[in-house]
UniProtKB/Swiss-Prot annotation:
GO biological process, one term: DNA catabolic process
Subunit structure as annotated in this protein's UniProt entry: Heterodimer of a large subunit and a small subunit.
Database matches in Pfam families: DNA_pol_E_B, tRNA_anti-codon
The organism's place on the tree of life at top rank: Archaea
Assigned protein family: Belongs to the DNA polymerase delta/II small subunit family.
Role, per record: Possesses two activities: a DNA synthesis (polymerase) and an exonucleolytic activity that degrades single-stranded DNA in the 3' to 5' direction. Has a template-primer preference which is characteristic of a replicative DNA polymerase.
Gene3D superfamilies: 3.60.21.50
Name assigned to this protein: DNA polymerase II small subunit
Residue intervals passing through the bilayer: none
Family matches, as InterPro entries: DNA_pol_a/d/e_bsu, DNA_pol_delta/II_ssu, Metallo-depent_PP-like, NA-bd_OB_tRNA, Pol2_small_arc
Length: 488
């Protein structure tokens, strides 16, 4: 797209991100020409004859040759669509729910009570829609089988039996699980909400069924679309280990500059990019992080991030959610970036909180950075970082993004629990653990979207082996394509 009103500093920045310095007089010449575009910058870089400084004479010769060509010679990029089309794309994206601008917690006792009551009520309502339950305090009055729903207070074992302490707003009860139910009970997490059906013997309920809130089979049903969504996370702009060359190759793919015809056709159909947190590497996140930073100023990291997102074709809508490395509060749910940081990014970027529930042309996407994955893996031995989609299944099964209170994931006691999965999404997108995995669970597409950071010294010490440069490209209701930009 040709931009008429452009200043020399912006022109210089465009050349700088491509590895070139431009003479100030040459930049002014481009401004006065009224022909500035990303394609023009690319073409000038190609004729720079290997030099790293773009002289005025180079620009003069280029513009002179350009004036002798037909206007159609500068082929419009895909992003040069009509303004109306871009606006229509923005309208098609709706933020349904996130915490931004709604946080009210002060951390007092009342906040904690309201937080846990909100969680209990939301998840109990889901279970009660499938099971006819009785308040725990009244369970003793029921003859035969009885069903209760409550929050898991404690799970312990004695012999081959597993005991579950369950509580609701009326009281507590001990549930006894044996056989296959005991296997299920051993994987229960503190503070999650479940239902139990069984026979009351004395003061204990002997379980014959444990009920999770879970998502219904087939989720919301298949929603076929003709566009593709790219899922990214953990870009870690500002890190010494940020994969600059791989990112550049990814952007070139989006522009249709690399790959075969099939790959280019795929890139043309990408309408949205969703980034699930850790946009920058941050400051003071872990011991010795300063040794891993290429940019030690947090604002500078976001400027660097914004300049890289600015290279993405403008017709692609980018949705950005924060993570634990970003400049927002550590406790979840996290709000979107503050205005000063948001102003750095191009206009095709939509900022949301963590988690965020968005509607993309009728496709419901739940974005969550995924910090609780660490907690879930530590509690359920069969799960691992190698298959993040298996962990995400557990989040959907429990209808909660971070069910464990008091684990590694700090949770803010908001008066409403924003991490309950009330509405079943079509897509659940997470990141955080720097590995790649996709799958389907009861009709919900799950994706954990890798990273753009190679292994850091700190990660070597804690034996974390990332799987960087993997990109999931998904057509709602259709196929998922995995692209590898690292190690190929």
């Amino acid at each position: 797209m040709v931009i008429k009103n452009i200043d020399a500093a912006t022109v210089a920045k465009k050349f700088l991100v491509r590895g070139y310095n431009i003479d100030p007089k040459a930049a002014e010449l481009i401004c006065k020409s009224g022909l500035f575009s990303d394609e023009l910058v690319d073409k000038i870089c190609r004729i720079a004859n290997g030099g790293f400084i773009i002289e005025k004479s180079v620009v003069e010769e280029f513009l002179r040759n350009l004036s002798n060509l037909k206007p159609a010679t500068l082929t419009p990029r895909p992003e040069e669509r009509k303004v109306e089309e871009v606006k229509a794309s923005c309208i098609a994206l709706k933020v349904i729910k996130d915490i931004t601008g709604k946080s009210s917690c002060q951390g007092n006792v009342e906040d904690f009570l309201m937080y846990f009551n909100s969680r209990l009520e939301k998840l109990s309502r889901i279970i009660r829609s499938r099971v006819n339950t009785t308040p725990i305090a009244h369970a003793g009055k029921v003859r035969g089988n009885v069903s209760v729903v409550g929050m898991v207070n404690e799970v312990y074992e004695r012999g081959d039996k597993c005991y579950i302490r369950l509580e609701d707003t009326t009281g507590t009860i001990t549930c006894v699980a044996t056989g296959k139910n005991a296997e299920v009970a051993r994987e229960l997490l503190g503070d999650e909400v479940i239902g139990v059906t069984g026979l009351l013997k004395g003061s204990s309920l002997y379980a014959n069924r444990i009920v999770f809130p879970d998502v219904p089979i087939n989720g919301n049903g298949e929603k076929k679309r003709d566009f593709y969504i790219v899922f990214l996370s953990d870009t870690h702009f500002g890190s010494k280990e940020f994969l600059e060359k791989e990112w550049e190759m990814f952007v070139r793919w989006l522009k249709g500059e690399v790959g075969g015809k099939k790959s280019q056709n795929l890139a043309e159909k990408v309408k949205y990019i969703v980034i699930a947190g850790d946009i920058v590497d941050g400051i003071g996140v872990y011991p010795g992080q300063e040794d891993d930073l290429a940019i030690s100023d947090i604002y500078g990291q976001y400027e660097f991030a914004a300049s890289h997102l600015d290279e993405i074709p403008k017709e692609i809508k980018i949705i950005v959610s924060p993570g634990n490395h970003d400049a927002v509060r550590q406790a979840e749910p996290q709000p979107a970036f503050e205005g000063e940081i948001r102003s750095l990014f191009p206009k095709n970027v939509e900022h949301v909180g963590n988690p965020a529930y968005v509607d993309i042309e009728g496709v419901k996407v739940l974005i969550y950075h995924g910090r609780s994955i660490d907690d879930i893996i530590s509690k359920i031995p069969r799960l691992s970082y190698d298959e993040p989609q298996k962990v995400m299944e557990e989040l959907l099964k429990r209808r909660h993004l971070s069910p464990i209170y008091g684990g590694r994931t700090p949770l803010a006691p908001e008066r409403e629990d924003y991490l309950v999965i009330e509405d079943v999404p079509d897509i659940l997108h997470c990141g955080h653990i720097h590995t790649y995995g996709t799958g389907f669970y009861r009709g919900v597409f799950m994706v954990n979207s890798s990273t753009w950071q190679a292994q850091t010294e700190f990660q070597k010490k804690v034996n974390l082996n990332p799987m960087p440069g993997n990109v999931a490209v998904y057509r709602p209701g259709g196929e998922v394509i995995r692209l590898r930009f690292y190690g190929e």
